[in-house]
Amino acid sequence: MKIQLIAVGTKMPAWVEHGFEEYRRRFPKDMPFELVEIGAGKRGKNADIPRILQKEGEAMLAAAGRSRIVTLDIPGKPWTTEQLAVQLEAWKLDGRDVALLVGGPEGLSPECKAAAEQSWSLSPLTLPHPLVRVLVAESLYRAWSITTNHPYHRE
């Protein structure tokens, strides 16, 4: 099973790239984890936000292909680390790849939300999108460590 983090936005600060990469490289070969960056639509004074969201959503769904789509969204379901580990095991048993979608400043398009099989809430707080990349990478790595009895996670 491959996991993709499909996120709107490019040109992240170095600390984001380093933080994400620190956890991405720890994933086992049989469960590769990759980042797919989607260019953000140009937002200006008279920007057509619904159209921008639609275009970003189309690109995200195209990148996801036939993967199980899981949106990261505040109204999604909050999972504890242990619950995320259970989800990870369920996804592995399902056999499909997983695409985790992170929207841009205005969130996800209605099409992305409609295509999602699950929605995951990292927090009721609004988090900066660059930080979400690092949090998701660490959370998934920690969940994997639970499923394999790796010593990274401690109770």
Swiss-Prot record:
Location in the cell: Cytoplasm
Positions bound to S-adenosyl-L-methionine: 72, 103, 122-127
Nucleus listed as a keyword: no
GO cellular component, one term: cytoplasm
GO MF, one annotated term: rRNA (pseudouridine-N3-)-methyltransferase activity
Reactions this protein catalyses: pseudouridine(1915) in 23S rRNA + S-adenosyl-L-methionine = N(3)-methylpseudouridine(1915) in 23S rRNA + S-adenosyl-L-homocysteine + H(+)
EC number, UniProt record: 2.1.1.177
Main location as per UniProt: cytoplasm
Keyword tags: Cytoplasm, Methyltransferase, rRNA processing, S-adenosyl-L-methionine, Transferase
Highest taxon of the lineage: Bacteria
A Pfam family that the UniProt record links to this protein: SPOUT_MTase
Record family assignment: Belongs to the RNA methyltransferase RlmH family.
Function in brief: Specifically methylates the pseudouridine at position 1915 (m3Psi1915) in 23S rRNA.
Oligomeric form and interacting partners: Homodimer.
Record-linked NCBIfam families: PRK00103.1-1, PRK00103.1-4, tRNA_RlmH_YbeA
Designated name of the protein: Ribosomal RNA large subunit methyltransferase H
Taxonomic lineage: Bacteria, Pseudomonadati, Pseudomonadota, Gammaproteobacteria, Aeromonadales
